[in-house]
From Swiss-Prot:
Gene symbol of the encoding locus: RPL10C
Family: Belongs to the universal ribosomal protein uL16 family.
SUPFAM superfamilies in the record: Ribosomal protein L16p/L10e
NCBIfam families, sorted: PRK04199.1-4, uL16_euk_arch
Species of provenance: Arabidopsis thaliana
One Gene Ontology term of the molecular function aspect: structural constituent of ribosome
Entries under InterPro entries matching the protein: Ribosomal_uL16, Ribosomal_uL16_CS_euk_arc, Ribosomal_uL16_dom, Ribosomal_uL16_euk_arch, Ribosomal_uL16_sf
Domain of life: Eukaryota
Record-given protein name: Large ribosomal subunit protein uL16x
Length: 221
């Protein structure tokens, strides 16, 4: 018996049903890699960021997420190069899908109980997505922004429903606008922290210290 089509599970119904000690025997999700490309590049390297945003409330299967990741990664490697981007999958397939297998042969009513005890067994996993939720994000240099948008456009065909490609006003994966990030970086109020950035606050007794040394202990001064 083949895999049931994902259109049967597209609508969100009922409560979330995650894997637990009560829900056993769940197949592993098809997607196992959520960060692709130069994921160790610093926050200053890739200022451009673009998102693929869901425009419907629906379930997205792990197979669709893996297909979108492969399509986006393949185009970016071919057009921009494998060292020129960082792709991140922003949703995780934690919701377990169930199936109540039914026989369709002659005399099936003698072998099964029909809809009695029809809770079903685990079939696969999916991600429950809301309207406006980000599915995929790509950060890169400004000159590869066109390639990133085209890569997400190709990945969009792997998902059901409607999605939008939105160019972010933020600097990379951070929460700071580009102009704000540049200004705070020049003032040394922002410290790079991997793919993100840490803001050095000026509240409290630390306000009298020099910018960039807010977390230095008093013993080292």
């Amino acid at each position: 018996m083949g895999r049931r089509p994902a259109r049967c599970y597209r609508q969100i119904k009922g409560k979330p049903y995650p894997k637990s000690r009560y829900c056993r025997g769940v197949p592993d999700p098809k997607i196992r890699i959520y960060d692709v490309g130069m994921k160790r590049k610093g926050v200053d390297e890739f200022p451009f960021c673009v998102h693929l945003v869901s425009w419907e409330k629906e379930n997205v299967s792990s197979e669709a997420l893996e297909a979108a990741r492969i399509a986006c990664n393949k185009y970016m490697v071919k057009s921009a190069g494998k060292d020129a981007f960082h792709l991140r999958i922003r949703v995780h397939p934690f919701h377990v899908l169930r199936i109540n297998k039914m026989l369709s042969c002659a005399g099936a009513d003698r072998l099964q109980t029909g809809m009695r005890g029809a809770f079903g067994k685990a079939l696969g996993t999916c991600a429950r997505v809301a309207i406006g939720q980000v599915l995929l994000s790509v950060r890169c240099k400004d000159n590869h922004g066109v390639h990133a948008q085209e890569a997400l456009r190709r990945a969009k065909f792997k998902f059901p429903g409607r999605q939008k490609i939105i160019v972010s006003r933020k600097w990379g994966f951070t929460k700071f606008n580009r102009a704000e990030y540049t200004k705070l970086r020049a003032m040394k109020r922002i410290v790079p922290d991997g793919v993100n950035a840490k803001f050095l606050s000026n509240h409290g007794p630390l306000a009298n210290r020099q910018p960039g040394s807010a977390f230095i202990s008093a013993t080292s001064e």
